[in-house]
Amino acid sequence: MKFRNLAVVIAALFLVAACESTSTESGKGSGDGKQMAKKGKKKGPPKGFSITPGSSQDLVVNVGDRVFFALDKSNLSSDARSTLEKQAAWLKKYGSVKITIEGHCDERGTREYNLALGERRANSAKDFLVALGISPNRVNTISYGKERPVALGHEESSWSQNRRGVTTV
């Protein structure tokens, strides 16, 4: 069942990515992932797909599963807080759902440093959700440090995509 859910999420992400137009952004800017966060805010499932309410696909497509961080920081930006507020509302709607928040970093820094930073990032997101009324028993955290990048480049535009927190169901 989990494999099927994962396959549906991956298929949906490919469809969404295939529909996106090419960007002319230079990759320069604040470097906190705000541009990437805005790109991921598409509403509703792709045509021909139905989303099970309360599922991981529902979270990804209708709420957003990622928040982004500035270099060497674990504090939440206003965009990150906005996404987490939506996640909290979604979690209140689906009271039996448990989540894991993954903390990720870019490739710079040692493995140990990035694991600790990823943990701080995941805990920052968890603490915010708990402050909004979500039971801490429903929220697990894990740090992957720099071990699971989503962008493989060696420049700021890639690094800003990798400095993230990802909420999984």
Where do the PLM segments sit?
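Extracytoplasmic/secreted proteins, especially bacterial periplasmic and envelope-associated proteins
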Residues: D79-K86, E112, A116, R120, ...
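A non-catalytic structural micro-motif
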Residues: G95-H104, E119-V150, R163-V169
